[in-house]
């Protein structure tokens, strides 16, 4: 399992003063990018420049309690499954140990020039399998 932390900024809030729900999806993507940098060992922008992309093809988010301005959201990233060209990840987000939202997404490995599906590269498969939970 990989852990990262995200700070809730003023611009993330809705008129009710809590994090606007689409921003929680952005937090999941930030955790995904942090996972690539911290666990996979390859910054996501580097892979992007090399033409390797991971678009989300399925996304689920379940909200448990409000996320507020100034919260430090701890997000755990767990690899649930590595397929031929897809990866399913689970995200568990909490503030001070209390769950605030959970999510899952499936990403597919693609060539960014053609958007054709590619097999998960062997070097990446090895790193992803090491993070399976």
Explain the meaning of each model-derived region.
Residues 1-74, 80-133:
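Terminal targeting signals and extreme-terminal segments of soluble enzymes
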